A protein has these predicted regions:
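Non-transmembrane, aqueous-exposed alpha-helical and coiled segments at domain scale
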Residues: 1-205
Length: 205
């Protein structure tokens, strides 16, 4: 699917590598999507962690339920997994992290000084007040139906993301995320006149 997207939407050359059974799912995934088939151990560890933290997570989410429903029709495993991926793509499920990326691109384009907490806070407030980005009033990557103090998955991903940012020379961008995580909960509470605790969720990093 990724190669078809590169070819037909990005107008780039298509290449196909065979997976290696001795590699992990994360290692194979990184190997398959890169022309030179190379990846670092840290990249593989980061993707592996993300895959593990997203897998099932209690069994009651939309994509897991989809697998149960489709499997009950006595279909094959591949069809059940394809249905689950279709569910996961939805904006109110796994597709939420795409909205985080889009929001962050917007923030990076509109906040001149990524180290200025006041400037960052002012723009996050504009987003929360439906004056910026998609004008939905949602600060994507913030809030969870169950987790309020912290999302344990986010805590683990943040630590690994920091390692990866250091290795890739992207600490300025990581610090921007860190600042948003710090200021957004209070802004959301203030804008919505709510005392409900808000924390970053698994989609943020």
């Amino acid at each position: 699917g990724y190669q078809a997207k590169r070819r037909y939407y990005d107008d780039k050359s298509m290449y196909v590598h065979n997976p290696k059974p001795e590699l992990s799912s994360a290692e194979n995934f990184l190997r398959l999507i890169r022309s030179d088939k190379t990846y670092t151990r840290l990249e593989a560890e980061t993707l592996d962690l993300a895959l593990i933290l997203h897998a099932e997570h209690g069994g009651g989410n939309n994509s897991s339920l989809t697998v149960h429903v489709v499997s009950s029709a006595d279909t094959d495993t591949y069809s059940a997994m394809a249905a689950a991926v279709g569910s996961l793509k939805g904006r109110r499920h796994g597709g939420a992290n795409i909205r985080v990326v889009e929001m962050m691109d917007d923030i990076k384009a509109n906040v001149k000084d990524w180290s200025n907490e006041n400037e960052i806070s002012a723009y996050i407030r504009k987003i929360a007040e439906k004056q910026a980005f998609d004008k939905s009033g949602l600060v994507y990557g913030m809030g969870h139906a169950v987790y309020t103090i912290s999302d344990p998955r986010e805590v683990l991903l943040k630590a690994k993301a920091k390692e990866l940012a250091k290795a890739k020379g992207c600490m300025e961008e990581f610090n921007l995320y860190d600042t948003i995580e710090k200021v957004a909960p209070g802004i959301i509470q203030d804008v919505h006149k709510s005392d409900k605790k808000v924390c970053a969720n698994v989609d943020f990093y």
